[in-house]
């Protein structure tokens, strides 16, 4: 089946050669330590040396691309109870993470650029913790994103992820940018790379699904943006959910059923 939202094969995933990025291990959830040394997380000795920078926050983990100044991917678990909480994004603005020992974008890079500050780990998934909410507003979790996409189909997909967490009890979620031919160039003094597209990969028990959306005013039907995790892995060169047993991973990632996701 043709899927109109799938971009052409990228040169590499957010600038990381695909042959290397396949080695990345899936991070565990909610590790408070997030210091990095020599480009490798102190809390993740099993992370491949090909990994650029891994930063662990209270609610999510980010693989950060210091060359492009955007994430390679973010990953977290979302449970049904975490879809609601007392903490709001009100009054929060993006800023640099003072604890991250990596070069980061600045607010001036985005100002008057024509691109929105797009969360990869959405603030709405972290209402259960004040600290986790604040940490979603670091530039280590941000990409230049088309505002119509940010407030439209991408926002709809983020809301559906919360619906699926309530339905299935728990999800593992990966989100990130895809850099193709860098058609949109860079923004700001620091030359923050503008992605060509964005992806989500979602695992719920014994089923999975993935989505890709171009970084423009994307009005494509959600079903047309869906694909198997295997297809997304072929597109990005990333091995999602690598902590799963190979036979289980291969079976679950090979197919997807839109009806299981209410699509």
Predicted regions and their residues:
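Short, charge-rich amphipathic segments
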Residues: 39, 74-88, 156-167
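Domain-level detector of nuclease and nuclease-like folds
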Residues: 98-263
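Short, His- and charge-rich active-site/binding loops that engage polyanionic ligands
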Residues: 55-117
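Context-gated lysine
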Residues: 22, 30, 42, 49-52, ...
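N-terminal start-of-chain detector that recognizes signal peptides
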Residues: 15-16, 23-37, 44-50, 88-95, ...
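N-terminal module-boundary/linker segments of secreted carbohydrate-active enzymes
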Residues: 2-71, 78, 246-263
């Amino acid at each position: 089946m043709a899927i109109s939202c799938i971009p052409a094969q990228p040169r590499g995933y957010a600038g990381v050669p695909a042959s290397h990025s396949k080695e990345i291990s899936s991070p565990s959830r909610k590790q408070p330590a997030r210091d990095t040394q020599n480009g490798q997380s102190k809390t993740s000795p099993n992370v491949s040396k090909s990994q650029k920078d891994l930063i662990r926050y209270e609610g999510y983990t980010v693989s950060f691309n210091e060359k492009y100044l955007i994430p390679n991917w973010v990953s977290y678990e979302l449970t049904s109870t975490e879809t609601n909480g007392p903490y709001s994004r009100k009054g929060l603005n993006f800023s640099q993470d003072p604890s991250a020992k990596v070069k980061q974008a600045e607010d001036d890079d985005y100002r008057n650029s024509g691109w929105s500050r797009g969360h990869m780990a959405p603030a709405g998934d972290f209402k259960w913790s004040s600290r986790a909410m604040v940490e979603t507003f670091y530039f280590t979790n941000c990409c230049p994103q088309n505002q119509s996409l940010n407030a439209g189909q991408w926002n709809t997909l983020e809301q559906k992820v919360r619906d699926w967490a309530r339905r299935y009890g728990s999800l593992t979620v990966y989100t990130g940018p895809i850099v193709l031919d860098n058609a949109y160039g860079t923004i700001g003094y620091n030359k923050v790379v503008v992605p060509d597209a964005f992806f989500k990969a979602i695992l719920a028990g014994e089923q999975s699904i993935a989505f890709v959306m171009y970084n423009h005013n994307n009005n494509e039907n959600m079903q047309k943006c869906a694909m198997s995790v295997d297809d997304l892995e072929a597109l990005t060169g990333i091995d999602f959910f690598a902590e799963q047993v190979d036979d289980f991973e291969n079976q679950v990632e090979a197919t997807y059923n839109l009806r299981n996701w209410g699509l």
